Amino acid sequence: MSQLSFRVDPGSAIVNVIANGKVVTLSPLWLRERCQDKEYLDSKTQQRLFDPHALDPNIQVLSAEQVDDTRVRVEFSDGYAGDYSILAIAPDFDLDDGLPSPKAWTSDLDPGKIKFSYPSLDSKAVLFKAIETYLEYGALILTDVPAEPESILQVAETFGHVRVTNFGKYFDVMSRPDSNDLAYRPVRLGPHTDNPYREPVPGIQLLHCLVNETSGGYSTLVDSLSAIQKLAEEDPRGVELLSQISVKFRFVDGDIELIERRPMIELDHQGRPAGVHYSPRLDYLPLLDDATTVAFHKARRRLGELFSDPAYELYFRLQAGELMMFDNNRVLHGRTSFNPNEGLRHLQGCYIDLDGPRGRYLSLKRTVAL
């Protein structure tokens, strides 16, 4: 969070904020919209009691008086006058909205950093730390989860609300020869994100191991942020193409066909890479001129090489009673092949939306003593 203070020069009607030593001049319209009086803002919900869209676009500050570093009194040309606290406008200077910044990682990430015992999450302080860790690294591994069917739903509700899809409220991952998805067969699955053909894409996936009697079937996780950073060093134009040009993703089943178009690299509101939509089994090259198609494909191919590079891959065996939760936009997942004749390998999975852990984190941040 920035170090903030008000500054109003004597005799001036200009309101400035000093943010980490930088002077930011506040627009009269921006400031007027953020009035804090109880007749304009509901204190409980923090929802406005007036329509800011109806404000005069040419509104001006008639006078501004600095009470101290944290408070100013401002009079506007529409007749409104009120006090402004620096605390009230501070969130607008935090482009991460109070959330921890992502920490990009590679294969040298210590799995212990993202591992928590599920029963320990009964403590709000531990739950807060677990969610903070998830938001930083994009993944969690939970141990001591009851190895019973549908336990995953209870875990999911700890972090958010279950997202129902055409696969149901949850789905079983085991070998099925005639399945509608390769995930249900014992073949190797390269790094990918789930459901890029869906709108919106399920933001978070949970996979819970009930039984794993095979010697194969190792789980893999890859942080797309590290791979994109490397690609940007090698081919900045390629990153630009992958983040600006939409590709078609398509899923076909007996009773449903889903098609969505979106860029392979997703950017956040600041224009920074936030993740990917990546599934070579499901995407199609966009219709472009030949030169752009070749440049796009080279970037796509190189990104795939980085995703499959062991230097970027976290590789582990998910045991019965363990659950991994990961940001389906940021962290790609995969699996080594396994022999179903060795024994049973049974996982259950489900999805929740991205805003679940974020909302819980911000709520806990207000109440948990740090």
Named regions from a protein language model:
Residues 102-129, 133-139, 144-370:
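Active-site environment of non-heme Fe oxygenases that use a 2-His-1-carboxylate facial triad
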